Regions:
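Soluble non-cytosolic domains of exported or imported proteins
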Residues: 10-17, 97-104, 125
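Aromatic-rich peripheral "rim/lid" segments of glycoside hydrolase catalytic domains that contact
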Residues: 98-100, 107-112, 123-143
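Structural motif
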Residues: 38, 121-123
Length: 143
């Protein structure tokens, strides 16, 4: 999994809200499942439009990489998402991903917008905390 856009949060909260505002204006909210991504991206820096490619990384792998690199995880208030930076072979990297806090903020939108529920994207990349959040707040059905 690769990305070619600029380094940024996978699903910034303002963009998620904008999509939900539009979707709920056109479709009955009770018919909408909000998708949640279960991956992050690792961008080499500096970013060069049209040249830089980010590698996909699971949220769990991102957190483990931050621990291994002793990189502090930074909370971005605007996007309501975490990221960190690290250096390898003289190249700085920025990794954006979701964690329990960012997932909880997005899951709260289901009730706020009175949506039918959530669907998770790329099963197998989930982080353990997500299952606790989902189990405590929702009835899980495999469809």
């Amino acid at each position: 999994m690769m990305a070619s856009g600029p380094p940024m949060a996978i699903a910034p909260i303002d963009q998620v809200r904008a999509v939900l505002d539009y979707a709920t204006s056109a479709i009955e909210p009770g018919k909408i499942l909000m998708g949640m991504s279960l991956y992050g991206y690792d961008w080499p820096l500096p970013y060069e439009k049209g040249r830089t490619r980010a590698s996909g990384v699971s949220n769990n792998a991102a957190q483990n990489l931050a621990i291994a690199e002793k990189a502090p995880i930074i909370w971005d208030v605007k996007s309501a998402s975490p990221y960190f930076e690290y250096m390898v072979a003289g190249v700085q990297h920025r990794v954006w991903f979701d964690d329990a806090q960012s997932a909880a903020i997005k899951l709260a939108l289901v009730d706020e917008y009175q949506l039918r529920g959530v669907s998770v994207w790329v099963l197998g990349n989930e982080f353990p905390q997500l299952w606790y959040l989902l189990k405590d707040g929702y009835t899980i059905r495999k469809v």
